[in-house]
Amino acid sequence: MAAVVFIAFLYLGVASGVPVLDSSLDAEWQDWKIKYNKSYSLKEEKLKRVVWEEKLKMIKLHNRENSLGKNGFTMKMNEFGDQTDEEFRKMMIEISVWTHREGKSIMKREAGSILPKFVDWRKKGYVTPVRRQGDCDACWAFAVTGAIEAQAIWQTGKLTPLSVQNLVDCSKPQGNNGCLGGDTYNAFQYVLHNGGLESEATYPYEGKDGPCRYNPKNSKAEITGFVSLPQSEDILMAAVATIGPITAGIDASHESFKNYKGGIYHEPNCSSDTVTHGVLVVGYGFKGIETDGNHYWLIKNSWGKRWGIRGYMKLAKDKNNHCGIASYAHYPTI
């Protein structure tokens, strides 16, 4: 009850134009602003400070509970600490899994097949460095380029960063909305029918919408099709083990996801029916001894290296398709 009253007073202060601030957090607030290069007008700073303080208290409470074994992951204050819920939602896409469409074919796992217990495609050199999408909602494009980059190695023998901006600018005829969001399915359709995709070197990321400037002479990767996986973690596991990194959609609309630091992420309110964010599944494994409850998917995000485990997350695996990890998964064929 005390926490509810405290938060109520915070918002009452905002409504009256006089935010109630905790002076003991002044130094921490200043350090955070410097670290993430934040600057505000005087009025805006007070409003953002209230949001930041609320997030900080929530994070500290969660981490105290983690130390008591009440949850399996930790959180930290990051660049999103001053974001309101409305601002955070603008970073999210929203795709109902019932719109899941088939690509070239459907993959099936062979009965009795034995898969490795640990997979990490980063260690094999199939994953480019973590990047930061910024204010452009291009998660879907980062996920798709990551999957194509990995598959292209089988042809070229080298890892070439591909152009996210090429997808942002040019896949609108397929139904994407550039920096306002997109769909990995539509992005694969663009690459397939366009006949190729440029590299990051010739078509660098700008983090904003622009005119399509694709030059076929600079194409570095082509695909022959793409595969949509059934909504099965078992089949997703087989694909990650035998094919390579796989694009996936997940429900990332929660404060716990936004502020994730480390450990195996499990959010009780996560949906498996609606996905809001595109990621790349680059592996899987388990923590400690192999027992129920400690298996994870290793996913690559596009929020920079300061988020999560240097840009990655361990998401709970074999927990009823947690956060929809297997609901909207695809991979390209080369």
Swiss-Prot record:
GO cellular component assignments: lysosome
Cysteine disulfide links: 136-179, 170-212, 270-323
GO biological process: protein catabolic process; proteolysis
Protein keywords: Disulfide bond, Glycoprotein, Hydrolase, Lysosome, Protease, Signal, Thiol protease, Zymogen
Active site: 139, 277, 301
GO molecular function: cysteine-type peptidase activity
Pfam family of the protein (one): Peptidase_C1
EC number: 3.4.22.-
Coiled-coil annotated residue ranges, if any: none
Keyword Lipid metabolism: no
Top enzyme class: hydrolase
Chain residues in the propeptide: 18-114
Residue positions the entry lists as glycosylated: 269
Keyword Protease: yes
Tissue: Placenta.
Signal peptide: 1-17
Subcellular location: Lysosome
Highest taxon listed in the record's lineage: Eukaryota
Record-stated family: Belongs to the peptidase C1 family.
Protein name in UniProt: Cathepsin R
Species of provenance: Mus musculus
Gene designation: Ctsr
